[in-house]
């Protein structure tokens, strides 16, 4: 068994034991073909300053919206921005698609599938 097959076996094992709840606006497709449809959308609230003379403004991030309270045996799939905010808030039950991983599959510049998740 190659390391990749071993990794996929571990992912499939986790999928059986742990429930993944996708709170991104898109269906997440794993390289092995497993699809996780969106069940909601978690976002980070934001406010913007006025634009300066160069057309640049500041963004200020606030609380996470649309993310349920922690649930036993559940990992919430969220965007990288939401994951960062969740980690800052002490949440350990969130992951994001591994879109920057070298095994991420792209076609015509768009992500087709990811090999797994990042914590």
Please identify what each model-predicted range represents.
Residues 3, 7-19, 23-27, 31-119:
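Intrinsically disordered, low-complexity segments enriched in small/polar residues
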